[in-house]
Curated annotation (Swiss-Prot):
The modification N6-carboxylysine is found at residue 229. Its EC number is 6.3.2.-. GO terms for molecular function: acid-amino acid ligase activity; ATP binding; magnesium ion binding. Its main location: cytoplasm. Pathway: Cell wall biogenesis; peptidoglycan biosynthesis. Gene3D superfamilies: Mur ligase, C-terminal domain, Mur-like, catalytic domain, MurE/MurF, N-terminal domain. It comes from Lactococcus lactis subsp. lactis (strain IL1403). This is UDP-N-acetylmuramyl-tripeptide synthetase. The gene is murE. PANTHER family: MUR LIGASE FAMILY MEMBER, UDP-N-ACETYLMURAMOYL-L-ALANYL-D-GLUTAMATE--2,6-DIAMINOPIMELATE LIGASE MURE HOMOLOG, CHLOROPLASTIC. Catalyzes the addition of an amino acid to the nucleotide precursor UDP-N-acetylmuramoyl-L-alanyl-D-glutamate (UMAG) in the biosynthesis of bacterial cell-wall peptidoglycan. Carboxylation is probably crucial for Mg(2+) binding and, consequently, for the gamma-phosphate positioning of ATP. Keywords: ATP-binding, Cell cycle, Cell division, Cell shape, Cell wall biogenesis/degradation, Cytoplasm, Ligase, Nucleotide-binding, Peptidoglycan synthesis. GO terms for biological process: cell division; cell wall organization; peptidoglycan biosynthetic process; regulation of cell shape.
Length: 483
């Protein structure tokens, strides 16, 4: 429960309160006592004692006409019968009010947050596995792939980083379930849309940066994308960063000026990988030792080193790190199937140019024969990925490419595929039915030297079409049908 008086106090303290508007009159304080027993931004879940948040570009006045709620919070006075708390920024208001409503659960958990263009989910699972070794399985996880609030039951995540109200509720549930630590991915959109406003993380990790999510719906420029991701730095008590990442200089400069304790990793830093072979690697620095992970590729080993440094800052021992990394399983990341002819089928969530480039390089290194890539690109977001995908394909002439559908949403998947192909000088294959594309790819293999890469969806069991999730068998099940 939270009192209206508390809500007003929170907003005033954040310089985010304009007035209360009711029946044509304006108030700087409310003369009556009001208690809210629920917060919501979904009109279908609102009740008579709910504090409702009217947010979103498409919010309409008619949503409030028959709304069952006590008050609503908005940047705009809709002049309806329901009293309104008018604010400058409704998303910031929701974040701070939710934190108070749920009794500041973020202060009772040890939190580790990860950002970067690629590797967030893999690193999140690495970190959870290490911390579980340290705390006996009491680590909650919020990732692109899955969410768990009790360490046992997992469910599919709707967003990489949930809306602030949902996020604070999840943190509170994790505490109730006995969790002591939380590992979560923080997207650039989370900072752009204030989903993590007011949160300070115990440890923040910045893995890498490359152009992605650039377009009219998400970030207009790379600068905006990078700036939003960089907000994790000033909202972390300790920070881990990749010294080999693009634009590292400003990260280093900002950390120094803000006097934030930190650790760097990479070839030109104290913490580095000095030996790498298959699933095994050796590190030097503050977490020096020999480690094994279940994923191929040096980039995965670099993510493991990043999480080793981050979890060490939370108290994990070298033994915890060693044992956790060895056991970590990441759903939808380089998931491996073997066809009857011995060919390998790799299923991976790689959904931007940098992730695809790293994935292709690893598979090329281990397979000398036919390499078939099944790939699509999302509609109505991340438009810059199409050029990036085309450039990766052009760079790797060994790839036999089948372009297909991947969450085309309100765009024509053939137009998306054509755009990818426009950046490639050789002829590509098209099969817009994703399952048939996978069938065709597997049929092209003959021996253990051959491999198929199915990129983009990982464990997703839906296709986004016209704004709705439509059932899809899933890449793994589709591939298994034709092994």
């Amino acid at each position: 429960m939270i009192r209206l008086e508390q809500v007003i106090e929170i907003l005033k303290k954040d310089n985010n309160f304009r007035e209360i508007s009711s029946a044509g009159e304006y108030y700087f304080n409310w003369p009556k006592e009001v208690n809210f027993d629920q917060l919501s931004y979904d009109s279908r879940k609102s009740t008579e004692n709910t504090l409702f948040f009217a947010k979103g570009l498409n919010f309409k006045k008619e949503y409030l006409t028959d709304l069952e709620a006590a008050f609503y919070v908005s940047e705009f006075d809709y002049e309806v019968a329901l009293p309104a708390i008018i604010v400058t920024d409704v998303k910031r208001a929701m974040a701070l009010i939710a934190a108070s409503f749920y009794d500041f659960p973020q202060n009772k958990l040890k939190t580790l947050a990860l950002t970067g263009t690629k590797g967030k989910t893999t690193s999140a699972y690495f970190a959870k596995a290490i911390l579980d070794k340290m705390n006996g399985g009491k680590t909650a996880l919020l990732s692109t792939a899955q969410t768990t609030l009790d360490g046992k039951n997992y469910f599919k995540s709707e967003l990489t980083t949930p809306e602030s109200l949902d996020l604070l509720e999840m943190m509170a549930k994790a505490l109730t379930n006995g969790m002591t630590h939380l590992v979560m991915e923080v997207s650039s959109q989370a900072y752009k849309t204030e989903r993590v406003y007011g949160l300070t993380f115990d440890v923040g990790v910045f893995l890498n940066i490359s152009p992605d999510h650039i377009g009219p719906v998400e970030h207009p420029t790379l600068e905006d994308y990078f700036y939003c991701k960089r907000q994790l730095l000033k909202n972390s008590r300790y920070f881990v960063a990749n010294s080999e990442m693009n634009h590292f200089a400003i990260i280093k400069e900002e950390l120094k000026e803000r006097k934030i304790p930190h650790a760097f990793y990479g070839a030109d830093s104290e913490n580095k990988i000095i030996e790498s072979k298959g699933l095994h690697f050796v590190t030097d620095g503050s977490v020096s030792g020999a480690f094994d992970i279940r994923l191929l590729g040096r980039f995965n080993q670099e993510n493991a080193l990043a999480t080793a440094l981050a979890t060490k800052a939370l108290g994990a021992s070298l033994e915890n790190i060693h044992d956790g990394l060895a056991l970590a399983v990441v759903p939808g990341r380089m998931e491996l199937l073997t066809a009857k002819n011995g060919a390998h089928i790799y299923i991976d969530y790689a959904h931007n140019g940098l992730s695809l480039e790293n994935l292709v390089e690893v598979v090329e290194e281990h397979h000398a024969g036919q390499l078939v890539l099944v790939l699509g690109s999302t509609g109505n977001k991340g438009e810059s990925r199409r050029k990036d995908f085309g450039q990766v394909i052009e760079k790797h002439p060994r790839l036999d490419v089948i372009l297909t559908t991947d969450d085309s949403n309100r765009e024509d998947p053939k137009i998306i595929a054509d755009e990818i192909a426009s950046f490639v000088s050789r002829t590509l294959d098209f099969e817009l039915d994703r399952e048939l594309a996978i069938k065709k790819a597997v049929s092209k293999t003959k021996s253990t030297d051959d491999a198929v890469i199915i990129a983009g969806k990982g464990t997703d069991m839906f296709q986004l079409k016209d704004g709705k999730r439509q059932p899809y068998i899933g890449d793994t099940a589709a591939a298994q049908k034709y092994l």
